[in-house]
Protein backbone atom coordinates (compact mmCIF):
# COMPACT_ATOMS: atom_id res chain seq x y z
CA UNK A 1 0.00 0.00 0.00
CA UNK A 2 1.43 3.38 -0.99
CA UNK A 3 2.13 6.12 1.52
CA UNK A 4 -0.33 8.39 -0.24
CA UNK A 5 -3.16 5.92 0.33
CA UNK A 6 -2.27 5.70 4.04
CA UNK A 7 -2.26 9.46 4.62
CA UNK A 8 -5.06 11.16 6.52
CA UNK A 9 -7.82 12.19 4.11
CA UNK A 10 -8.66 15.87 3.74
CA UNK A 11 -11.43 16.97 6.09
CA UNK A 12 -13.52 20.10 6.42
CA UNK A 13 -11.92 20.74 9.82
CA UNK A 14 -8.25 19.73 10.08
CA UNK A 15 -7.14 18.35 13.44
CA UNK A 16 -6.20 21.09 15.86
CA UNK A 17 -2.65 21.39 17.13
CA UNK A 18 -1.57 21.88 20.73
CA UNK A 19 -0.22 25.31 19.81
CA UNK A 20 -3.59 26.33 18.37
CA UNK A 21 -5.39 25.06 21.47
CA UNK A 22 -3.11 27.14 23.68
CA UNK A 23 -3.93 30.29 21.73
CA UNK A 24 -7.73 29.98 21.82
CA UNK A 25 -9.54 32.30 24.21
CA UNK A 26 -12.42 30.47 25.92
CA UNK A 27 -14.14 33.00 28.18
CA UNK A 28 -17.54 31.76 29.39
CA UNK A 29 -20.65 33.11 27.69
CA UNK A 30 -24.31 32.66 28.58
CA UNK A 31 -27.50 33.59 26.75
CA UNK A 32 -29.21 33.64 30.16
CA UNK A 33 -27.43 36.95 30.80
CA UNK A 34 -27.51 40.30 28.98
CA UNK A 35 -25.01 40.68 26.17
CA UNK A 36 -22.01 42.92 26.74
CA UNK A 37 -23.60 45.41 24.34
CA UNK A 38 -26.78 45.48 26.44
CA UNK A 39 -24.81 45.91 29.66
CA UNK A 40 -22.90 48.78 28.09
CA UNK A 41 -26.20 50.32 26.98
CA UNK A 42 -27.60 50.13 30.53
CA UNK A 43 -24.45 51.73 31.93
CA UNK A 44 -24.52 54.51 29.33
CA UNK A 45 -28.21 55.24 29.96
CA UNK A 46 -27.62 55.32 33.71
CA UNK A 47 -24.84 57.87 33.29
CA UNK A 48 -27.10 59.91 30.99
CA UNK A 49 -29.70 59.85 33.80
CA UNK A 50 -27.12 61.46 36.14
CA UNK A 51 -25.79 58.34 37.86
CA UNK A 52 -22.05 58.94 38.43
CA UNK A 53 -20.01 56.64 36.20
CA UNK A 54 -18.08 55.38 39.22
CA UNK A 55 -21.34 54.38 40.92
CA UNK A 56 -23.21 52.52 38.16
CA UNK A 57 -22.45 49.09 39.67
CA UNK A 58 -23.47 49.95 43.22
CA UNK A 59 -26.62 51.73 42.03
CA UNK A 60 -27.48 48.78 39.79
CA UNK A 61 -27.15 46.54 42.83
CA UNK A 62 -29.79 48.61 44.61
CA UNK A 63 -32.24 47.53 41.90
CA UNK A 64 -30.98 43.94 42.10
CA UNK A 65 -31.45 44.00 45.87
CA UNK A 66 -35.08 45.12 45.43
CA UNK A 67 -35.69 42.28 42.98
CA UNK A 68 -34.00 39.81 45.35
CA UNK A 69 -36.81 40.56 47.80
CA UNK A 70 -39.70 41.14 45.40
CA UNK A 71 -39.03 39.30 42.15
CA UNK A 72 -37.67 40.24 38.74
CA UNK A 73 -40.47 39.17 36.41
CA UNK A 74 -42.05 41.43 33.81
CA UNK A 75 -45.01 41.78 36.19
CA UNK A 76 -42.97 43.02 39.17
CA UNK A 77 -43.91 46.55 40.22
CA UNK A 78 -40.63 48.22 41.09
CA UNK A 79 -40.96 50.92 43.74
CA UNK A 80 -38.78 52.98 46.03
CA UNK A 81 -35.92 55.45 45.70
CA UNK A 82 -32.33 54.79 44.76
CA UNK A 83 -29.36 56.41 46.49
CA UNK A 84 -29.38 59.01 43.71
CA UNK A 85 -32.04 61.55 44.79
CA UNK A 86 -33.35 62.26 41.28
CA UNK A 87 -33.62 58.61 40.21
CA UNK A 88 -36.11 56.00 41.40
CA UNK A 89 -35.67 52.25 41.23
CA UNK A 90 -38.55 52.18 38.74
CA UNK A 91 -36.55 54.48 36.45
CA UNK A 92 -33.56 52.15 36.72
CA UNK A 93 -35.79 49.20 35.80
CA UNK A 94 -37.05 51.14 32.77
CA UNK A 95 -33.46 51.82 31.73
CA UNK A 96 -32.69 48.11 31.91
CA UNK A 97 -35.68 47.25 29.72
CA UNK A 98 -34.82 50.05 27.26
CA UNK A 99 -31.47 48.35 26.62
CA UNK A 100 -33.26 45.37 25.10
CA UNK A 101 -32.72 42.91 27.94
CA UNK A 102 -35.08 41.73 30.67
CA UNK A 103 -34.97 42.67 34.32
CA UNK A 104 -34.41 39.03 35.26
CA UNK A 105 -31.44 38.62 32.92
CA UNK A 106 -29.95 41.82 34.30
CA UNK A 107 -30.39 40.66 37.89
CA UNK A 108 -28.99 37.25 37.01
CA UNK A 109 -25.77 38.95 35.88
CA UNK A 110 -25.32 40.30 39.42
CA UNK A 111 -26.57 37.15 41.20
CA UNK A 112 -23.16 36.10 42.61
CA UNK A 113 -22.74 39.57 44.12
CA UNK A 114 -26.14 39.75 45.81
CA UNK A 115 -25.63 36.16 46.99
CA UNK A 116 -22.50 37.24 48.85
CA UNK A 117 -24.18 40.36 50.23
CA UNK A 118 -27.29 38.65 51.60
CA UNK A 119 -26.66 34.92 52.08
CA UNK A 120 -26.55 33.74 55.71
CA UNK A 121 -27.40 37.30 56.77
CA UNK A 122 -30.76 38.41 55.39
CA UNK A 123 -32.94 36.08 53.32
CA UNK A 124 -35.29 37.31 50.58
CA UNK A 125 -38.22 39.06 52.27
CA UNK A 126 -40.83 36.84 50.62
CA UNK A 127 -39.17 33.48 51.28
CA UNK A 128 -41.90 32.19 53.59
CA UNK A 129 -44.74 33.42 51.39
CA UNK A 130 -43.07 31.63 48.48
CA UNK A 131 -43.27 28.31 50.31
CA UNK A 132 -39.60 27.79 51.14
CA UNK A 133 -38.45 25.93 54.23
CA UNK A 134 -36.17 27.84 56.63
CA UNK A 135 -33.25 25.61 55.64
CA UNK A 136 -33.54 26.71 51.98
CA UNK A 137 -34.72 30.30 52.42
CA UNK A 138 -31.59 31.89 50.94
CA UNK A 139 -32.50 30.37 47.56
CA UNK A 140 -35.88 32.12 47.50
CA UNK A 141 -35.21 34.56 44.67
CA UNK A 142 -36.10 34.10 41.03
CA UNK A 143 -32.67 34.68 39.53
CA UNK A 144 -30.94 32.20 41.84
CA UNK A 145 -29.84 30.24 38.76
CA UNK A 146 -27.28 32.97 38.07
CA UNK A 147 -25.35 32.44 41.31
CA UNK A 148 -23.05 29.80 39.84
CA UNK A 149 -23.06 31.09 36.26
CA UNK A 150 -19.38 31.69 35.41
CA UNK A 151 -20.30 34.40 32.89
CA UNK A 152 -21.97 36.53 35.57
CA UNK A 153 -20.11 39.22 37.51
CA UNK A 154 -17.91 37.49 40.07
CA UNK A 155 -17.17 38.68 43.63
CA UNK A 156 -13.51 39.63 44.20
CA UNK A 157 -12.86 36.60 46.43
CA UNK A 158 -15.40 34.22 44.91
CA UNK A 159 -18.66 33.03 46.44
CA UNK A 160 -18.84 33.07 50.23
CA UNK A 161 -20.25 29.57 49.86
CA UNK A 162 -21.80 27.46 47.13
CA UNK A 163 -25.55 26.84 47.25
CA UNK A 164 -26.46 23.60 48.97
CA UNK A 165 -28.17 20.79 47.11
CA UNK A 166 -31.30 21.46 49.16
CA UNK A 167 -31.27 25.10 48.04
CA UNK A 168 -30.84 24.11 44.40
CA UNK A 169 -33.71 21.62 44.55
CA UNK A 170 -35.98 24.03 46.44
CA UNK A 171 -35.45 26.78 43.89
CA UNK A 172 -35.93 24.46 40.90
CA UNK A 173 -39.11 23.05 42.45
CA UNK A 174 -40.48 26.51 43.20
CA UNK A 175 -39.79 27.55 39.61
CA UNK A 176 -41.84 24.61 38.33
CA UNK A 177 -44.68 25.47 40.72
CA UNK A 178 -44.80 29.01 39.32
CA UNK A 179 -44.86 27.66 35.76
CA UNK A 180 -47.72 25.36 36.76
CA UNK A 181 -49.65 28.24 38.32
CA UNK A 182 -49.14 30.38 35.22
CA UNK A 183 -50.44 27.57 33.02
CA UNK A 184 -53.45 27.09 35.29
CA UNK A 185 -54.33 30.76 34.91
CA UNK A 186 -54.07 30.67 31.13
CA UNK A 187 -57.54 30.91 29.59
CA UNK A 188 -57.81 29.41 26.12
CA UNK A 189 -61.56 29.87 25.68
CA UNK A 190 -62.84 32.40 23.13
CA UNK A 191 -65.50 33.71 25.52
CA UNK A 192 -65.55 34.65 29.18
CA UNK A 193 -69.14 33.51 29.49
CA UNK A 194 -69.60 31.02 32.32
CA UNK A 195 -71.87 29.10 29.93
CA UNK A 196 -68.78 28.44 27.79
CA UNK A 197 -66.05 28.23 30.42
CA UNK A 198 -68.19 26.42 33.02
CA UNK A 199 -66.20 28.35 35.60
CA UNK A 200 -62.91 26.78 34.50
CA UNK A 201 -59.81 28.92 34.24
CA UNK A 202 -58.29 26.75 31.52
CA UNK A 203 -59.62 24.27 29.03
CA UNK A 204 -56.87 21.79 29.79
CA UNK A 205 -55.50 20.88 33.17
CA UNK A 206 -51.75 21.48 33.53
CA UNK A 207 -49.78 18.77 35.23
CA UNK A 208 -46.49 18.59 37.05
CA UNK A 209 -44.46 15.44 36.67
CA UNK A 210 -42.00 14.65 39.42
CA UNK A 211 -39.11 12.24 39.15
CA UNK A 212 -39.28 9.33 41.59
CA UNK A 213 -37.12 9.68 44.71
CA UNK A 214 -33.75 7.93 44.65
CA UNK A 215 -33.86 4.37 45.93
Swiss-Prot record:
Keywords: Acetylation, Capsid protein, Helical capsid protein, Ribonucleoprotein, Virion. It comes from the Viruses. InterPro entries: Pltvir_coat. GO terms for cellular component: helical viral capsid; ribonucleoprotein complex. The modification N-acetylserine is found at residue 2. GO terms for molecular function: structural molecule activity. PROSITE patterns: POTEX_CARLAVIRUS_COAT. The keyword Ribonucleoprotein applies. It is found in: Virion. Its main location: virion. Required for genome encapsidation. Forms ribonucleoprotein complexes along with TGB1 helicase and viral RNA. Belongs to the potexvirus capsid protein family. This is Coat protein. It comes from Papaya mosaic potexvirus (PMV).
